[in-house]
Amino acid sequence: MSGFHNVGNINMMAQQQMQQNRIKISVRNWQNATMNDLINFISRNARVAVYDAHVEGPLVIGYVNSKAEAESLMKWNGVRFAGSNLKFELLDNNGASAGTSDTISFLRGVLLKRYDPQTKLLNLGALHSDPELIQKGVFSSISTQSKMFPAMMKLASTEKSLIVESVNLADNQLKDISAISTLAQTFPNLKNLCLANNQIFRFRSLEVWKNKFKDLRELLMTNNPITTDKLYRTEMLRLFPKLVVLDNVIVRDEQKLQTVYSLPMKIQQFFFENDALGQSSTDFATNFLNLWDNNREQLLNLYSPQSQFSVSVDSTIPPSTVTDSDQTPAFGYYMSSSRNISKVSSEKSIQQRLSIGQESINSIFKTLPKTKHHLQEQPNEYSMETISYPQINGFVITLHGFFEETGKPELESNKKTGKNNYQKNRRYNHGYNSTSNNKLSKKSFDRTWVIVPMNNSVIIASDLLTVRAYSTGAWKTASIAIAQPPQQQASVLPQVASMNPNITTPPQPQPSVVPGGMSIPGAPQGAMVMAPTLQLPPDVQSRLNPVQLELLNKLHLETKLNAEYTFMLAEQSNWNYEVAIKGFQSSMNGIPREAFVQF
């Protein structure tokens, strides 16, 4: 018995030793395929097994058995995979590149010390005389010196507490901007930049920033040789199209500049070429999404034998600064069907992934996850544009928004891989967690339908679905917090158009019937009797459905808020009565007197 016990101990010690010898690695630029494809690719080509693989943001993290295997894997840096060049890195146990944790912490500390949140100024002036940087040996060699600024900018781009509008780079012995060129990628919306007291002498060295700082208002270049050139002012105006102040001198009329660069119309959540198209498109979208979420087969009668459908995955991860964005999206259920032609290189695959006709379209419908849209409950989370298409006597609807994945597909296309193929790749496929890339989550989407009216119904000639990582809509305006103190509220209110009709919900669909027996419930008939003290602008009232008008009336009578504040309260609560009342009750002490009806 003791012999068996000793053998067990030896095996356990051997396993522990293997665990201790494992090397943690990461892989970048893999998102155009599934993690399973990546692990199999590595095992087939590099002959290295990756264990316990999982996704962390843009990285696949895993382990290899030894340092020798890790070094072997590093030789594959730059290898092409799914249209991108893979990048392998060695990591320590905390996920940071080996030997870099201390440096990252140090540079992060330097950034935070030099940032003023009051003025939103990042002061990177006179870095060569900074005692901390000198002691750390940052300037001990050209190599470390050249890497410092890009590393600082990479850290700054991920540091959410840094909201930078101005950067000072004075007194840094700069002869050109090659060492600081990444500033434009990190802070593209920079408004003020100081490069004074350097040694910049060529316009050509600034060309890399041409049209990069599109909001740069003020530039300070004093005490640089370049300022003595007779073309200096002309070149600076050419490089920076919105520059107003150069070396403390006004060089452009700011009001005229704003007129030139302002759009002829404000960004709108909903745009319809005419009222008729607006009604038709909202009817269609509401009805379509309802059946898409509940019974997709009933949609098939909307497609003709020539109709086309395709799905495309945009695997780009939103910037970390975007509120509520998904930094670890999973697209496993979509990848095998994705027709993103910027990622799919095979002409055969591009053709195969275009579904034509009802049977083919139905097949791909079944491979997509079950969903739930919230167009009616949360209309502010969606944006729609509709334009006519005279060539086919039809129109084009484009809808942006989000959906929740509520269930696995009826048919999982990523399980079509044959048994033999699985066995072939199994040897080097250790540690792959297939569920991580197939998790159900919230997704953003863009969907474009080309609609052709026909025989008192419609036909979908083309249907294109693009799936993206979830992020808030760009059309959404900043919420106005009712709970703000009166003195703060006064400074915010003038910026808000009084119940802007352009940011309201789409009109509620009226009764209509389309192919397949789909019908859209209409709104109650008869005019809503509003409280005499609830005076809504006609253009606003005309865009609200009876349910919303009833909610406004009910909130107005209950809270005694005036029309503007009642509308704001309803909109901020996503037209949910219970949420609105709770919000009102918790914010009563902060609501200004003028927000209430004056009797």
Swiss-Prot record:
Keyword Acetylation in annotation: yes
Annotated region (Disordered), positions in chain: 408-439
Residue ranges annotated for the LRRCT domain, each copy included: 224-262
N-acetylserine modified-residue sites: 2
Keyword Zinc: no
Any one Pfam family match given in the protein's UniProt record, by short name: NXF_NTF2
PANTHER family: NUCLEAR RNA EXPORT FACTOR (PTHR10662), NUCLEAR RNA EXPORT FACTOR 1 (PTHR10662:SF22)
Primary role: Involved in the export of mRNA from the nucleus to the cytoplasm.
Domains: entry comment: The leucine-rich repeats and the NTF2-domain are essential for the export of mRNA from the nucleus. The NTF2 domain heterodimerizes with MTR2. The formation of this heterodimer is essential for mRNA export and binds to all of the nucleoporin-FG-repeats.
Protein name, entry field: mRNA export factor MEX67
Species, as recorded: Saccharomyces cerevisiae (strain ATCC 204508 / S288c)
Native organism taxonomy: Eukaryota, Fungi, Dikarya, Ascomycota, Saccharomycotina
